[in-house]
């Protein structure tokens, strides 16, 4: 009799459903309006890294005994250790030690298994360069201690702690 009546009812139901979905999305948007921003202004603000952060590797040349444990435990055989055997004292003398941070996966195995603790992880993570060959650090570059983020007065540090809801 009136074939258009069910179509109008179906259209009305779809309109109500669409309005409900829009309202749900709007409520989610309003719930996010009161939250603090998550982003930081990176070069001027930096997050304080955790105590166990695995950044650039620091190397102490005087402590190394050239045992090559770091090379054996590295999943990609990355550290290059050059040494010379001193026959009169029957010991290895370290000549050169280098790590290519363009290849390093920062797993920390070399630091963990080093018997003399001559390797350690720092909180330095800004290693970007325009030339990948500059990422190959020798023992002099690895021995340089980085400036602590907390001690740098030119930037504002932000503590990265989860918020406690009260």
Swiss-Prot record:
Where this protein primarily resides, as one coarse class?
A: plastid
* Entry's Gene Ontology molecular function annotations: 4 iron, 4 sulfur cluster binding; iron ion binding; NADH dehydrogenase (ubiquinone) activity; quinone binding
Bilayer topology annotation: Peripheral membrane protein
- Kindly list the cofactors needed: [4Fe-4S] cluster
Task: Supply the InterPro entries for this chain.
Answer: 4Fe4S_Fe-S-bd, 4Fe4S_Fe_S_CS, NADH_quinone_OxRdtase_chainI, NDHI
Q: Give a yes or no for keyword NAD in this entry.
A: yes
Where does this protein reside within or beyond the cell? Plastid, Chloroplast thylakoid membrane
| Residues reported to bind [4Fe-4S] cluster 1 | 64, 67, 70, 114
Q: Where does [4Fe-4S] cluster 2 bind?
A: 74, 104, 107, 110
Gene Ontology CC annotation, any one: chloroplast thylakoid membrane
Q: What class of enzyme is it?
A: translocase
| Protein task | NDH shuttles electrons from NAD(P)H:plastoquinone, via FMN and iron-sulfur (Fe-S) centers, to quinones in the photosynthetic chain and possibly in a chloroplast respiratory chain. The immediate electron acceptor for the enzyme in this species is believed to be plastoquinone. Couples the redox reaction to proton translocation, and thus conserves the redox energy in a proton gradient.
Assembly and oligomerization: NDH is composed of at least 16 different subunits, 5 of which are encoded in the nucleus.
**NCBIfam families (UniProt xref):** ndhI, NuoI, PRK05888.1-3
Q: What is this protein called?
A: NAD(P)H-quinone oxidoreductase subunit I, chloroplastic
Organism name: Oblivia mikanioides (Salmea mikanioides)
Q: What is the lineage of its organism?
A: Eukaryota, Viridiplantae, Streptophyta, Embryophyta, Tracheophyta
């Amino acid at each position: 009799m009136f074939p258009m009546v069910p179509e109008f009812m179906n259209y009305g139901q779809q309109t109500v459903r669409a309005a409900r979905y829009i309202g749900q999305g709007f409520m989610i948007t309003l719930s996010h309006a009161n939250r603090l921003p998550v982003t930081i202004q990176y070069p001027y603000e930096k997050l304080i890294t955790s105590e166990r952060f695995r950044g650039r590797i620091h190397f102490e040349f005087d402590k190394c005994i050239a045992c090559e444990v770091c090379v054996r435990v590295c999943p990609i055989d990355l550290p290059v250790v050059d040494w010379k055997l001193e026959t009169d004292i029957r010991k290895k003398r370290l000549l050169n030690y280098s790590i290519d941070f363009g290849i390093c996966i920062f797993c920390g195995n070399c630091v963990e298994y080093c018997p003399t603790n001559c390797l350690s992880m720092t909180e330095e993570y800004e290693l970007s360069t325009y030339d990948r060959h500059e990422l190959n650090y020798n023992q002099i570059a690895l021995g340089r201690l980085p400036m602590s983020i907390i001690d740098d007065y030119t930037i504002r540090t932000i503590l990265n702690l989860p918020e406690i809801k009260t």
